[in-house]
Design a protein with these regions (language model features):
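N-terminal low-complexity, intrinsically disordered tails enriched in Ser/Pro/Gly
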Residues: 2-7, 26-32, 54
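Short, solvent-exposed beta-strand/turn "edge" segments of beta-rich domains on protein surfaces
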Residues: 6-9, 29, 150-155
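Structural motif
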Residues: 21-33, 163-172
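Tryptophan-paired
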Residues: 38-93, 172-228
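Short, low-hydrophobicity acidic/polar segments
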Residues: 49-155
Length: 228
């Protein structure tokens, strides 16, 4: 009988990550239906990036989708940003494994600057959807031949609808009203907490003048505006 040396034994473990988005009004996992791209970042105990991977497209909508990750056994700080692509309204810096730190992984909302004297920062288009997920200490072990860990996601973006309607039925002229929202919420840290940022002014990306029956789009007595 032959005895295999320790170096000849296959002790490899397959690690996979499942992303779950059920923090919504339906309390159902909507990841496969809503998320089109997802990036996972893994940091070591010193906050140094050791691994990152992005997957996108139809594969995310497949039943039972999980992301295969090539990590050594150990403890990792996992961070996920989802919804980022070339057309996204948000961006994160390029980071490099072995060099970049956790604090560098900030997410910034795109904005325009007005020609006014104060150079106001403006957001006047519909925001693309953005999700964030984090597991501060996830252990990957050799206890089994495979391991699946879950990263829960929260959605950062929302749509605000403002409806202005005259009670006496008199037509509301859409061009006579302007709605804006101001906030300094355009810069998020790796843990999804807001960082200090300039004030942003949000303008409606969609305006409609409709009837008193809000199920119609005919001219009438109500104005409907959407802001992201």
């Amino acid at each position: 009988d032959s005895i295999l040396g320790e170096e000849e034994v296959d002790c490899s473990v397959e690690y996979r990550v499942k992303f779950k988005y059920d923090y919504n009004m339906k309390y159902a996992d909507a990841f496969s239906r809503e998320v089109g791209t997802v990036t996972l970042y893994a940091f070591d105990d010193n906050g140094k990036l050791v691994y990152q991977k992005t997957e996108e497209g139809d594969v995310l909508g497949e039943e039972g989708y999980t992301m295969k990750v090539d990590l050594e056994p150990g403890d990792y700080h996992l961070v996920t940003w989802a919804g980022l692509n070339d057309e996204a309204s948000f961006s994160v810096p390029l980071v490099t494994a072995g060099e970049s730190s956790l604090d560098e992984l900030q997410c910034r909302m795109d904005r325009l600057y007005s020609r006014a004297a104060d150079g106001t920062a403006v957001v006047n288009s519909k925001l693309s959807a953005l999700w964030h997920g984090e597991v501060t200490k996830q252990s990957f072990s050799r206890a089994a031949s495979s391991q699946v860990v879950t990263v829960p996601l929260v959605k950062n973006t929302n749509t605000i609808r403002i409806i202005l309607q005259q009670m006496d039925g008199v037509t509301v002229e859409v061009d006579k009203f302007e709605f804006t929202i101001t906030d300094d919420n355009g810069l998020m840290n790796y843990d999804n907490k807001l960082l200090e940022d300039e004030t942003l002014t949000y303008y409606p990306y969609y305006r409609m003048q409709g009837g008193t029956d809000m199920g119609t789009r005919a001219d009438g007595a109500a104005e409907d505006s959407n802001l992201s």
